[in-house]
Amino acid sequence: MTNQNQSQTQTTQTVEKVSSRQKKKKRVCSFCVERIYDIDYKDVNRLKKFLTERGKIMPRRTTGNCARHQRQLTRAIKRARILALLPFIVE
């Protein structure tokens, strides 16, 4: 009887593990959707969306940007930081 209970609990645990992992929706590059070919370093409001609360640049896997636009975004953020449009560190 205890063996059956143990096997039932094991199967319910595996079912819970599978159901807890849901397939995430693939993110699409927002710059490609809006047909923005060159990212401008002076557009500070758009650049702020791709920074964390600590001021770090978000990775591609979280933003959903394509490789080309992620490179342009990184360059634009770094230029904006040098020109003091964006802070290096957020307090």
From Swiss-Prot:
One of its GO terms (cellular component) is cytosolic small ribosomal subunit. Gene3D superfamilies: Ribosomal protein S18. Keywords: Ribonucleoprotein, Ribosomal protein, RNA-binding, rRNA-binding. It comes from the Bacteria. Residues 1-24 are annotated as: Disordered. Coiled coil: none annotated. The keyword Translocase does not apply. Residues 1-14 have a biased composition (Low complexity). GO terms for biological process: translation. One of its GO terms (molecular function) is structural constituent of ribosome. The keyword ATP-binding does not apply. Binds as a heterodimer with protein bS6 to the central domain of the 16S rRNA, where it helps stabilize the platform of the 30S subunit. Part of the 30S ribosomal subunit. Forms a tight heterodimer with protein bS6. Belongs to the bacterial ribosomal protein bS18 family. PANTHER family: 30S RIBOSOMAL PROTEIN S18, SMALL RIBOSOMAL SUBUNIT PROTEIN BS18M. This is Small ribosomal subunit protein bS18. It comes from Caldicellulosiruptor saccharolyticus (strain ATCC 43494 / DSM 8903 / Tp8T 6331).
